Amino acid sequence: MNDRHNDLRVEGLAKSYGPEAPVLRGLDLTVPGGALAAVLGPSGCGKTTLLRVVAGFLRADAGTVALGGRTLVGPGVQLPPERRRIGIVPQEGALFPHLSVARNVAFGLTGTDRDERRRRTEEMLDLVGLSGYGDRMPHELSGGQQQRVALARALAPRPGLVLLDEPFNALDSALRAGIRADVRAALRATGATALLVTHDQQEALSTADVVAVVRQGRIAQCDTPQDLYRRPADPWVAGFVGDAVLLPGTVGDGGATATTPLGTVALTAPADPGRTGTLVLRPEQLRLTDAGAAVRATVTDVCFYGHDAKVTVTVEGLDTPVDVRVTGPLPVGPGRRTGIHVTGEATLHP
């Protein structure tokens, strides 16, 4: 990480598909060299358009894109894709079906002699865990293996940036976690900067060094996965990157806590006494207690997931139900009364 030669800087990027269809609206994004950044957002937010502009497949209406200080997009500048030092891993690998695995990986190694191409190809296949697969054809591989080959092909020419366009979508859920870990390890080993476009919150939080949440063509928040989850910029971000519990609250006299329908809650940052707003919590911060507790709730639903369960309760003073994550034996069922209290801190938003 922190290889400045591969820093990605996007400033003021704008792109519209007609006068009534703006997609990117002055988007700014900085990815440190060697980092894996996830671009996360709902369908239609502009994340794929961002990737295509960075790759050179689309022209921006305004703004700049620079990689390692070299301008790729800007006033009077539009480098063609083949001159950008960018590798691409598309959604389903898109391997050349008539070429062997080795020839797919070596496809971009132009200007090198045969021995160097062979050495680099073997190195990349070993890196992605496919040593010995060079003579196979794409149709002989599983979906996960095809994605590994696509990654090896993207990394072989030593790009400064690798773009991954929802590369795990077509894989079975049982395979995704393992493939994600392998892709992350391969990118780290080469030191390439990477941009992963995804709509999968779990994928973004578990894979990336930084996560940029896109909303309506702008970055709503760009942060580490931990800070994004624990200190969301606003209630919308909180709800998009995970289950959120939103509570009305009033800051207490000391400025360090707020009074809510679930009791007194500590704040992540001091606030002016008397200020009102919305507190953001996560379901795992809530605990079910004895029914005689100060704050009481009624269980309306229980969803069991194996590793944990989601217990939905109603609380007096709240218009919407509250979800509580419970591990271990379930102490309550629908219709039962229970106590509830908050652990940890909450962020306060206007």
Where do the protein language model's features map onto the residues?
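Non-catalytic connector elements of ABC transporters
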Residues: 244, 254-350
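A short, flexible loop at the N-terminus of ABC-type nucleotide-binding domains that lies
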Residues: 1-10, 14-26, 75-79, 113
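The feature captures the beta-strand-to-loop junction immediately N-terminal to the Walker
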Residues: 40-42
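Conserved coupling/switch loops of ABC nucleotide-binding domains, chiefly the family-specific signature
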Residues: 61-64, 216
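Helix-to-loop junction immediately C-terminal to a conserved catalytic motif
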Residues: 55
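Conserved ABC transporter NBD signature motif
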Residues: 63-74
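ABC ATPase nucleotide-binding domains
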Residues: 85-87, 91, 95-236
